Amino acid sequence: MDIKDLHNKFLECSSIVDIDSRSIREGSMFFAIKGDNFDGNEFVEEALNKGAKYAIVDSDSVNIVNRKILRVKDSLGTLQKLATFHRTKTNSIVIALTGSNGKTTTKELIDCVLSSNFKTISTKGNYNNHIGVPLSLLQIEDDTEYSVIELGANNFGEIDFLTKITLPDYGYITNFGKAHLEGFIDIEGVIKAKTELYNWIIENNKTLILNFDDKQQKKFRNHKNISFTSKDDGDYKFELISGKKISVKNRDIKYHSNIYGDYNYSNICAAITIGLHFGIDSIKIKDALNSYELQNNRSQVLNMNGKEIILDAYNANPTSVSNAIESFSRIKNSKAVVLGDMFELGNNSLDEHKKIVKLLSSKNIDSCYFIGEDFFKVKSTNESFYFYRTKKEFYNSSDEILESYVLIKGSRGMKMEEIIENKIK
């Protein structure tokens, strides 16, 4: 089917797309996507019975019993092409961002700032892959002024692929850290993969958003860009105001946030920079930042049983864990760290876990609790360090967290938020 004709049918569906037959919305266009453990083609009848207006299928086993079923060569590829075609038919300014750490937080901050003055859509949750990005683009409506799209990747070429689907007007990389080393091998691989976004932006004469405090990003300063910095060489200069929650100053204006951790400083600066660049009044930006609250176990500050808990269990890699430790160690009161294993590090895993243990040995932390097979394999004899293979071992131990401040962090698969319910409450 011609993509233009398919797009017309998509508009007939009030621009609603579904890929899960369990949650079909009335009048939607259902794409039968194949996954590792499922085949959407098997659920076409269910989707139509639940109210889908059209079903896009790519299996010969599906009988074309009426005009509602449309067969294509590849359902997923067609979804991606439809998203790109739809993006070209809108007037929305599209901002794409990627990076090793802080993508979701930065996306939400940018969305929060832009939404204070414009009609804006953004990637829902972490829908940042080859399926989520097209679904995000298909949210764009005729009156959407700005779209903030998050791009994720585990391997080389994925950012380039997603960028070509997205066709962004602006591109931003939050940072380069030791994430997904299973696919990227080392930090040089991470830089190569993430800069696929910047390379596309440059090739297509679009605009880079650069953090000049990052030496890798500053290498792109001779290309069309808007920039921010803590020095004097960027378009927007920021100063970090010390405190438990991040505040920054630009010129004589102070912007306050509810966000913990110095490592979120550049995320906030990027959002303010974009807001100012697009002409949003500083008072609106201040109000937007002040209203933003982190969710989903990302640098959340919780108070319970006389303790202040920094729950940063959304995900973890060596760079984000190191940054969290550096920031947390500056707290003056008694403090404890509870860390879970970091995943997707490939052959670097034990070495990176050992580096984290060594880093904590040099910090003034009262107690450190390490959970997971990899941390257990590199355990040390430090008397204030405690190692457990599993969370269950930790729960069953007599070890008690007595400190006033507690940092909890680990990879998503470790589900470190469960520590609160089982060991602190």
For every predicted segment, state its role.
Residues 405-421:
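Peripheral docking tails and interdomain loops at the edges
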Residues 48, 57-66, 172-308, 333, ...:
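Acidic, Mg2+-coordinating active-site environments of NTP-dependent enzymes
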Residues 28, 47, 82, 97, ...:
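Residue-level signal for inorganic ion chemistry
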Residues 4, 77-212, 216-224, 275-276, ...:
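Phosphate-binding loop of NTP-binding sites
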Residues 17-21, 36, 259-270, 294-299, ...:
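Short glycine/threonine-rich catalytic loop with a Thr-x-Gly-x-Asp
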Residues 9-17, 77-80, 128-131, 151-156, ...:
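Short gly/ser/thr-rich secondary-structure transition/capping motifs
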Residues 21-32, 119-120, 131, 135-147, ...:
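Mobile, glycine- and charge-enriched loop segments
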Residues 1-81, 85, 260, 326-332, ...:
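N-terminal leader/targeting and accessory segments in enzymes
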